Amino acid sequence: MSERDTALEKYKSYLLQHREWDSKLKDLRFGNRDLVKKYDKTEDDIKSLQSVGQIIGEVLKQLDSERFIVKASSGPRYVVGCRNNVDQSHLVQGVRVSLDMTTLTIMRILPREVDPLVYNMSIEDPGDISFAGVGGLNEQIRELREVIELPLKNPELFLRVGIKPPKGVLLYGPPGTGKTLLARAVAASLGVNFLKVVSSAIVDKYIGESARIIREMFGYAKEHEPCVIFMDEIDAIGGRRFSEGTSADREIQRTLMELLNQMDGFDYLGQTKIIMATNRPDTLDPALLRPGRLDRKIEIPLPNEVGRMEILKIHLEKVSKQGEIDYEALVKLTDGTNGADLRNVVTEAGFIAIKEDRDYVIQSDLMSAARKVADLKKLEGTIDYQKL
């Protein structure tokens, strides 16, 4: 072998070694990067274990570009500085901050305090409901979407015409006609934040607590816009005010006054809307019903023949059936019933099928169930619902 060939072979072997060491170096660099990450994480964990807790305070006033007056959670007020990495433009009156234990320097900005009751309202899931699953209320759905959906999705339409969009809507009518179902359909179709409020749960035995929950509820809604607040059974706190009464009645009246104040404080083109529901509209306070607070009142009546047929078809859609179903006969037999009664008819028909050891429903099951529900309706009292 010539000297040239020997040198060439050596060059090739060195080149292969170089590539091999180069790939090993890359692997080591990647391993080193992972080790550095683990080291930094361990350092942070050690610091967090060794670090001292911080005091929670509230900003009262900014004195100059570097100093703030802060009220600590324990009560006293201090003039303090601020860390360089804290955005001072967010340090306005009322903002919660954490303070260093020794120097009382503002360390970070904290989110606003949320009452657990309000937080539980916000995690209420409206469910997988669409307007297609609400039968016999086409006109009411149109009116509700005009008030709630249109201002949230197309506020420029109202600016163009020069009118102010409504703030809220009242749904009233007999029990079981679909008031809560409509509100859930609105929340599910819009995909916005949704606060489900049971009005009776707001009332607290301690003076001022109910009004505080109302304030926190509206404050949370404004911070998480767009938001829809649904207040069910509003007659629990929205009843007509009177001069006599116990201390509990006066507390409910204070709660109502706070609610009226919060509704008046809305920005018209704000992204917070209210839906209220009741089956006793005659007991509500006139101040709550006036335009500017509840601009539109939508009556949810008992379904007519067309509505009852739509509701029955919706409830029977996923039910195993055999033979032809005579919907017209069912509709005539269920005169004066509401949507909840019609759902009960389908459930009772299912029970009859189970008793007879069948896995499907037939026409006679539905007719028997409709007669049973009609007999039970005679036990219920009636209220004459006047248009508001």
Curated annotation (Swiss-Prot):
GO terms for cellular component: cytosol; nucleus; proteasome regulatory particle, base subcomplex. GO terms for molecular function: ATP binding; ATP hydrolysis activity; proteasome-activating activity. SMART domains: AAA (SM00382). PROSITE patterns: AAA. The 26S proteasome is involved in the ATP-dependent degradation of ubiquitinated proteins. The regulatory (or ATPase) complex confers ATP dependency and substrate specificity to the 26S complex. Belongs to the AAA ATPase family. One of its GO terms (biological process) is positive regulation of RNA polymerase II transcription preinitiation complex assembly. Transmembrane segments: none annotated. ATP binds at residues 173-180. This is Probable 26S proteasome subunit rpt4. Keywords: ATP-binding, Nucleotide-binding, Proteasome.
